[in-house]
Swiss-Prot record:
Organism expressing this protein natively: Oryza sativa subsp. japonica
UniProt feature coiled coil, ranges: none
Residue spans of biased composition, Low complexity class: 21-32
CDD domains noted in UniProt: ABCG_PDR_domain2
Protein name: ABC transporter G family member 46
Residue positions binding ATP 2: G888, I889, S890, G891, A892, G893, K894, T895
Length: 1440
């Protein structure tokens, strides 16, 4: 048995399996446990049978005993699984119980959406504001709608019957996903739906569609920190047998009545499906084995930044964490479940796809399930597993019926599938205008394009279409619907168990993220120590009102420090929202069972943070020593922390966007801070804004803290000339209610806010949906092609931007010219691209080994060694003009090998020799001549397709290539991969907006091709593409190879034609070992000859796909059956020796050759890199309304709010308190706007950073030009923000209108916002994710607050901390603002002191040193910008 571990996987060694009597013995020895729901009514109704079920023994089998392994197992094969299914069904048949089934009907189903067409759909700042105004005008019926209606599905009709597998085919964009969503009842409310959909004759309002059907999305959404086992286990715990319990109960009752002895194997399985806590574990293990995920069960799922399982394994995981499919009971005993699965084969090899589909097919056929599965490139053997076909094209159903009649239908239209072309490929191409002609059987002279609408109409006249129409006319007999088929309850498990599952997961996530919380606590400890030493009790006395205000300042600072620490909660909440919305919509759980654990489980963190703060600061600073008052302070701060965390969670759920959430959160911090009663006392708040004071949680916290402290015995002494105690005077001077009851009022209000914010959080989670564009903006070219395919006529855009029919060809006309030109276009080589020179290179690698540090999970399991080896002694060569396929089952290590060879690994240990053209590989030069198409399509979301290609070509093509040649080169490859219709389409974020999956894949390929590389690595270039698009891509790749380039591709599901377009094959098996490296030969003859010569390997069938056969005969199961170690067979072969000789020959430089050498490190100069990066950032920012537009909106709101709250404060100079209020306005405004800029820019940096990692690995540019581009693009937006804010606030606050004072105000605000923005960039650059950057930055926000000069003047800062005052950027901002506005004012206060003298004596500000403050703020902006650049240069947080 092979104990090795795959790339990205942790291998869980399979336990020995026992059968028959061992299973029965395990059952008899298992302890007793309760069933899912203990219902006394069942006991009364069913008597002894119910008691048997109520005390079902949990099938907790001893080690070495498991449920039978279904298809794809290491021991038990397809026949065993099928036998098990028949045996299971026999349980019900022999007692006369009919299993529930579902028949889905849809009639005249139409789905329409509205979308902007062309540039109007780009999310620019102007378009965003225009859309808002347009929406308001539409609401008031002042204007007409400018969106264009798009028909997604048109008059779709059909019947999906039980016991039959239905394959949904269609090119991307044809409406497959919309049809599946409509049938599953999960279409978004933003689209218009008409027509009828019924389940067993019942409309969807009569049952719960999400519980009666399961939709599996094509996008992988999982919590990256959880392991595969934990992900499936959670899914299993949230699902249940539900109504099927009664069905099983009836089965047992009838068995007892008829004295039938249960079969041990099926009886164990039945009990596993109906027991309580043990069910999830058994179900999880079963699913892991069904999907071949047991080898990576204890590996975290991972994401783009966190290394985890492979892409194919994620697809398997996604396919079986959908509701109703995730438990073994529901997978094997579908019992009336309707499955709708969307492109589940993406990233899977053809063998794994076949095994999974075969498992589903056997289940559907035997147990009467209903399934519709959309596949893009099904292999012929996978295609044969289906009974029915639904073929969509441009929203039209062109065929829906038995698979046996589909070729007959198209033959009646004059089309025939060609030899060696898969039927599925033929069906997807025959409706395409560019591919239809090749299948015409009556000669080219008679051909004219038959549009989609004509084919759809012809199907209605075909006998299959007529039969469906006739059957739909007869209503379904509702009496035939099984009572257990359609679910009327929302959840399959009682809410108590669902809540427990969420609590367990939340605790698990808390442990996985413990470093973040520990780091957060350590930083709070640091801030507390600093505050303690600044406000040390030896400098803090209880002898004056001024010192009393200092103590209130400490309390204010403490609340701010704890409040800023709560910001980390928002980042964590945002990160989990996509997974939450997916699981909520699929009815895994109600929102409250998610929100309650996320609140309660985090409570100890708030408790710990509060203890840290109070224990460090309380007694050292000199608060009242009474232990009760210490506890009271702790209680207020703890409850306030809980309220603030609830507020930030609520903001995250409300905004659902990291950038918008950051902006809104800072706005809320501003409101609660300014309205707290500290910056402006209650007496100074305007009457019309007093509501803000009464609604601020911070006000209640400060009131409670102040009353607790200043009504204590420590403040009971009266000052000379006053009768009232000093503490009472302090409270009255700041407008605090001097009554003891206000402690309890404040605490009660905070508790109310805790409940309010968490209730609002739950409500938002319950009613809102994930922010995404349900209908992507459509380019005019795309809409034009869609209409041309539908009608057969050329389309012309009207003057208003709408595409209208232009009948350039009559119905009887011949459009051979257009069609033939398209056909020629598709097959033409890259003639224009070939004019660009390149240096052919070849690569050899010998004895490559790659290992990582042993994961903790495996150490716990007892695996020895300090490292885990993922690649083992791999050797091979890639040569110019040779197209090499790198293949193996999912998780074999293909991507890992590509990463190692391309130099993309950022961690782990690599051993072995790699040469390029005979010389040792140097990564810097190799990156210049290589391209890497990554499996994850990572692009800048706010660029268009053409701009993305332009940026890549601009920075990667040699500097001597002029712009016109570069443009021609780009256009050539856009034509080759058919991106011209998408030229002006926005790339967007995967799964949320912009391009579809297959469009992004083509863009990924084009981005690398336009760099004109000599050697290209392609990781699954055809994954996510339909057969036609895959053929286009591979045709393009073949053309590139024929030019003399070296290309190696990992590929999963090649058709025969695509597979045989490769020249050589590098085949790997699990464990990272090679089992075949050599030529394919004509019709794969060399490959077939090699494997058929091995004893025990079955012969390939005639017409069978060699790639599928190859994976089948070399799988782990076959190795165990035949006893053949394919790795050892290869190493003992003559082929291996020939390869070693070839590697030895190619590893030596040829005579007259020279090593790769470039005069410069990058293709373009530093200046060009800066210009290109600035060009890209300018476009990205202009199309980023959540960042720019929202920022401007809140800037205006904050300016008006502050101007109102501090109205005329600049003219009030009659008292020191008035000046302090003016200073408070400056302090709060610069901090609020600054922190808003700093926080909102961090998600922007993080989103683009994944793209930056890819581009830097390609040596497109140095990190410094990238950083400079992002810094410079901010400057005009900051200037506009400063201008908007400055003009509003300066005039409303009544500062003196002189050119000098206004200039200095704008100057300091501009550079303050600049250094805050650049600080946010730097924080993001120095940390791995948004949550961590929030923790780091908020720590410095708190310290800057402390040393800003407002809470404690410079003159009163202890000498040992005064040095930090000089390096605190905010201190220089406050210095500059106060000095420029009041440093030259000769007016006197009521006590006779001049304003300028007070500014100098109290604050230590000197007008003569104003230029120093100006230089300081400029220096900080430059410093943070430089540090941002170096953070990108020095740190790489991508784990690969």
């Amino acid at each position: 048995m092979d104990d090795d571990v795959d790339a990205g996987e942790i291998y869980a060694v399979d336990r020995q399996r026992e059968e028959g009597s061992a299973s029965a013995a395990a059952f008899s020895r298992s302890p007793s446990t309760g069933r899912v729901d203990d219902d006394d009514d069942d006991l009364l109704t069913y008597g002894r049978s119910a008691r048997r079920m109520a005390a079902l023994p949990a099938p907790a089998m001893p080690e070495g005993t498991e449920l039978r392994r279904p298809v794809g197992g290491d021991v038990v094969g397809d026949d065993d699984y099928l036998r098990f299914l028949y045996k299971f069904k026999e349980l019900f048949d022999r007692v006369g119980i009919k299993l529930p089934t579902i028949e889905v009907r849809y009639k005249n189903l139409n789905v329409e959406a509205e979308s902007y067409v062309g540039s109007r759909g780009l999310p620019t700042i102007l378009n965003t504001y225009a859309n808002i105004l347009k929406g308001l005008a539409n609401t008031l019926h002042m204007t007409t709608r400018s969106k264009q209606k798009i028909s997604v599905l048109h008059n779709a009709s059909g019947i999906i019957k039980p016991h039959r597998m239905t394959l949904l085919l269609g090119s991307p964009g044809s409406g497959k996903t919309s049809l599946l969503l409509a049938l599953a009842g999960t279409l978004p409310s933003t689209v218009k739906v008409s027509g009828m959909i019924t389940y067993n004759g019942h409309t969807m309002d009569k049952f719960i569609p999400q519980r009666s059907a399961a939709y599996v999305s094509q996008h992988d959404l999982h919590m990256a920190e959880l392991t595969v086992r934990e992900t499936i286990n959670f899914s299993a715990k949230c699902q249940g047998v539900g109504h099927h319990y009664d069905l099983f109960l009836e089965l047992l009752r009838r068995e007892e009545e008829e004295n039938i002895t249960p079969d041990p194997e099926t009886d164990i399985y039945l009990k596993a499906a109906t027991t309580g806590e043990e069910k999830a574990e058994i179900v999880t293990n079963h699913i892991l084995k069904i999907l071949r995920l047991d080898i990576c069960a204890d590996t975290i799922v991972g994401d783009n930044m966190l290394r985890g399982i492979s892409g194919g394994q994620k697809r398997c995981l996604d396919a079986h964490t959908a509701p109703n499919v995730d438990s073994a009971a529901e997978m094997l005993v579908t019992l009336g479940r309707a499955l709708f699965m969307d492109e589940i084969s993406n990233g899977l090899d053809s063998s794994t796809t076949f095994q999974i589909v075969n498992t589903i097919q056997q289940t559907i056929h035997v147990l009467g399930g209903t399934a519709v599965i959309a596949l893009l490139q099904p292999a012929p053997e996978t295609y044969e597993l289906f009974d029915d076909i639904i073929l969509l094209s441009d929203g039209q159903v062109v065929y829906s019926g038995p698979r046996d009649h589909v070729l007959e239908f198209f033959k009646s239209l004059g089309f025939k599938c060609l030899e060696r072309i898969g039927v599925a490929d033929f069906l997807q191409e025959v409706t395409s205008r560019k591919d239809q002609k090749q299948y015409w059987i009556h000669g080219d002279d008679t051909y004219r394009y038959i549009p989609v609408t004509v084919i759809a109409e012809a199907f209605q006249c075909f006998h299959v279409g007529q039969a469906i129409r006739s059957e739909l006319a007869i209503p379904f007999d509702n009496s035939k619907s099984h009572i257990a088929a359609l679910k009327t309850s929302k959840h399959g498990v009682n809410l108590k168990k669902i809540l427990k599952a969420n609590i367990d997961r939340e605790i698990l996530l808390l442990k996985r993220k413990s470093f973040l919380y520990i780091f957060n606590a350590l930083q709070l400890t640091l801030v507390a120590i600093i505050a303690m030493s600044v406000f040390i009790h030896t400098n803090m006395h209880h002898d004056s009102i001024e010192n009393g205000r200092m103590y209130m300042g400490v309390q204010f600072f403490g609340t701010l420090a704890i409040m800023f620490k709560g910001l980390a909660e928002m980042g964590a909440a945002l990160a989990n929202l996509p997974v939450f919305f997916k699981q909520r919509d699929l009815l895994f759980y109600p929102a409250w069972t998610y929100s309650l654990p996320s609140w309660i489980i985090k409570t100890p963190i708030s408790f710990l943070n509060t203890i840290i703060w109070v224990s460090i600061t309380y007694y050292v600073i000199g608060f009242d020593p009474n232990i009760e008052r210490c506890f009271r302070q702790f209680l207020v701060l703890f409850v306030m922390s809980e309220a603030i965390c609830g507020l930030f969670r609520f903001i995250a759920a409300l905004t659902r966007h990291p950038v918008v959430a950051s902006t809104v959160s800072e706005f809320c911090i501003l409101i609660v801070m300014v309205s707290s009663g500290f910056i402006l006392s209650r007496d100074e708040v305007k009457k019309w804004l007093i509501w803000e004071y009464w609604t601020s949680p911070l006000m209640y916290a400060l009131n409670a803290l102040a009353v607790n402290e200043f009504l204590s015995p420590s403040w009971n002494e009266a000052l000379p000339g006053f009768r009232e105690p000093l503490g009472r005077l302090v409270l009255e001077s700041r407008g605090v209610f001097p009554e003891a009851k206000w402690y309890w009022i404040g605490l009660g209000a905070l508790l109310g806010y805790v409940l309010l914010f968490n209730i609002l959080y739950t409500i938002c989670l319950s009613i809102l949906t994930l922010l995404k564009r349900n209908v992507r903006e459509m380019s005019q070219e795309t809409l034009q092609i869609k209409l041309e395919n539908l009608t057969g006529y050329d389309q012309e855009p009207s003057s208003g931007g709408r595409v209208t029919n232009d009948k350039r060809y009559t119905e009887g006309g011949n459009n051979d010219e257009a069609t033939s030109s398209n056909a020629n276009h598709n097959s033409s080589p890259a003639r224009k691209g070939s004019i660009l020179p390149f240096v052919p290179v070849y690569m050899t690698f010998e004895d490559i080994r790659y290992s990582i540090d042993m994961p903790k999970a495996l150490k716990v399991q007892g695996m020895a060694g300090s490292r885990l080896e993922l690649l083992k002694d791999l050797s091979g060569s890639f040569r110019p003009g040779v197209l090499t396929a790198l293949m193996g089952i999912s998780g074999a290590g293909k991507t890992t090998l590509l990463d190692v060879l391309a130099g993309r690994k950022t961690s782990g240990h690599i051993h072995g020799n790699i040469t390029v053209s005979g010389y040792p590989k140097k990564q810097e030069t190799f990156s210049r001549v290589s391209g890497y198409c990554e499996q994850n399509d990572i692009h800048s979301p706010n660029l268009t397709v053409y701009e993305s290609l332009m940026f890549s070509a601009w920075l990667r093509l040699p500097a001597e290539i002029d712009s016109m040649a570069r443009k021609r080169f780009i256009d050539e490859f856009m034509e080759l991969v058919e991106l011209f219709p998408l030229k002006d389409a926005l790339v967007g974020l995967l799964g949320l907006s912009g391009l579809s999956t297959e469009q992004r894949k083509r863009l990924t390929i084009a981005v690398e091709l336009v760099a004109n590389p000599s050697i290209i690595f392609m990781d699954e270039p055809t994954s996510g593409l339909d057969a036609r698009a895959a053929a286009i891509v591979m045709r393009t790749v073949r053309n590139i190879v024929d030019m003399g380039r070296t290309v190696v591709c990992t590929i999963h599901q090649p058709s025969i034609d695509i597979f045989e377009s490769f020249d050589e094959l590098f085949l790997m098996k699990r464990g990272g070992e090679a089992i075949y490296v050599g030529p394919l030969g004509q019709h794969s003859c060399e490959l077939i000859k090699y494997f058929e010569s091995i004893e025990g390997v079955r012969k390939i069938k005639h017409g069978y796909n060699p790639s599928t056969w190859m994976l089948e005969v070399t799988c782990t199961l076959q190795e165990q059956i035949t006893g053949v170690n394919f790795t050892q067979v290869y190493k003992n072969s003559e082929l291996y020796r020939r390869n070693k000789n070839l590697i030895k020959e190619l590893s030596t430089p040829h005579d007259g050759s020279s090593d790769l050498l470039f005069p410069t490190k990058y293709s373009q100069t530093f200046v060009i890199q800066c210009l290109a990066c600035l060009w890209k950032q300018r476009l990205s920012y202009w199309r980023n309304p959540p960042y720019i537009a929202v920022n401007f909106f809140f800037t205006v709101v904050i300016a008006l709010l502050f101007g109102t709250m501090f109205w005329g404060v600049g003219r009030k100079r009659q008292s020191q308190q008035a000046l302090l209020s003016a200073m408070g306005s400056m302090y709060s405004t610069c901090f609020t706007l600054g922190v808003q800029n700093s926080s909102s820019v961090q998600p922007v940096v993080n989103i683009e950073r994944t793209v930056f990692y890819r581009e830097r690995a390609s040596h497109m540019y140095s990190p410094l030009p990238y950083a400079l581009g992002q810094v410079v693009v901010e400057l005009p937006y900051i200037f506009l923000q400063t201008l908007i804010y400055g003009v509003i606030v300066y005039s409303m606050m009544g500062y003196e209108w002189t050119c000098t004072k206004f200039f200095w105000y704008m100057f300091f605000m501009y550079f303050t916002l600049s250094y805050f923005t650049f600080y946010g960039m730097m924080a993001a650059g120095l940390t791995p994710n948004y949550t961590m950057s929030s923790i780091v930055s908020t720590t410095f926000y708190a310290i800057w607050h402390l040393f800003s000069g407002f809470l404690i003047p410079k003159t009163r800062i202890p000498i040992w901390w005064r040095w930090y005052y000089w390096i605190c950027p905010v201190a220089w901002t406050i210095n500059g603002l106060v000095t420029s506005q009041f440093g030259d004012v000769d007016d006197k206060f009521d006590n006779g002191v001049r304003v300028s003298d007070f500014v100098e004596s109290y604050f230590g500000y000197n007008l003569d040193l104003l230029w120093v403050a100006a230089m300081a703020v400029v220096s900080f902006a430059i410093l943070f910008a430089i540090l941002f650049g170096f953070s990108l240069k020095l740190f790489n947080f991508q784990k690969r």
